């Protein structure tokens, strides 16, 4: 299992961005990571898995979050189609993301790859599974006031890999298990 970079040259990997340069740079690093992962897999048994964060974050809070999320979802589809890979040689696993991630020394607002509807639709469109981060799911469910058990039941058929840690509130990420609220 390989985890793709989230930050390159102090710029967030974000294929959902409206900034063409950022999307191009993000697609470039993801393509290089895909190619390198496939090359590394020649030394191991089985198809490699690549955990990917697609982005969809902003420093500012949006006025119309549903519209922002819908636009980022559309942009992620458009961008993902540009990646060149053979699903027989690598399993790409987008990871569900938290609502208030910390990047580059500050708290951001996440608008992509959190809601179960968009994750499921994306997975169906590209025949993908996901990396299910329990901490991220808990943070999102706390933020969106959703039941984590119901949320997880909907996502479960698409899970291929799991990240486990505890959490607190809507931005307390990566807490030691049994020291948080999950």
Residues covered by each model-derived region:
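Hydrophobic faces of well-ordered beta-strands that scaffold small-molecule active sites
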Residues: 1-5, 48-52, 92-95, 130-133, ...
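Active-site acidic/histidine proton-transfer and metal-coordination neighborhood
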Residues: 13-129, 139
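Active-site beta-loop-alpha junctions enriched in small/polar residues
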Residues: 5-7, 55-57, 95-99, 134-139, ...
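Gly/Pro-rich active-site loop or hairpin
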Residues: 14-23, 107-113, 136-182
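Short, functional N-terminal and low-complexity linear motifs
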Residues: 1-3, 118-119, 152-159
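A short glycine/small-residue-enriched secondary-structure motif
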Residues: 3-14
């Amino acid at each position: 299992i390989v985890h793709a970079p989230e930050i390159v040259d102090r710029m967030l990997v974000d294929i959902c961005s409206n900034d063409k340069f950022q999307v191009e740079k993000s697609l470039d690093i993801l393509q290089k990571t895909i190619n390198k992962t496939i090359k590394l897999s020649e030394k191991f048994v089985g198809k490699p898995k690549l955990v990917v964060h697609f982005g969809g974050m902003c420093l500012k809070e949006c006025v119309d979050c549903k519209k922002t999320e819908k636009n980022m979802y559309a942009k992620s589809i458009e961008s993902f189609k540009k990646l060149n890979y053979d699903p027989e040689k690598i399993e790409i696993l987008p990871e569900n993301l938290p609502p208030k991630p910390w990047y580059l020394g500050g708290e951001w607002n996440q608008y992509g790859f959190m809601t179960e509807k968009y994750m499921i639709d994306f997975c169906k469109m590209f025949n993908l599974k996901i990396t299910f981060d329990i901490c991220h799911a808990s943070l999102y469910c706390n933020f969106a006031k959703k039941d984590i058990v119901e949320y997880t039941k909907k996502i479960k058929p698409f899970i291929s890999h799991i990240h486990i840690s505890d959490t607190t509130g809507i931005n307390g990420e990566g807490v030691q298990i049994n020291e948080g609220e999950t």
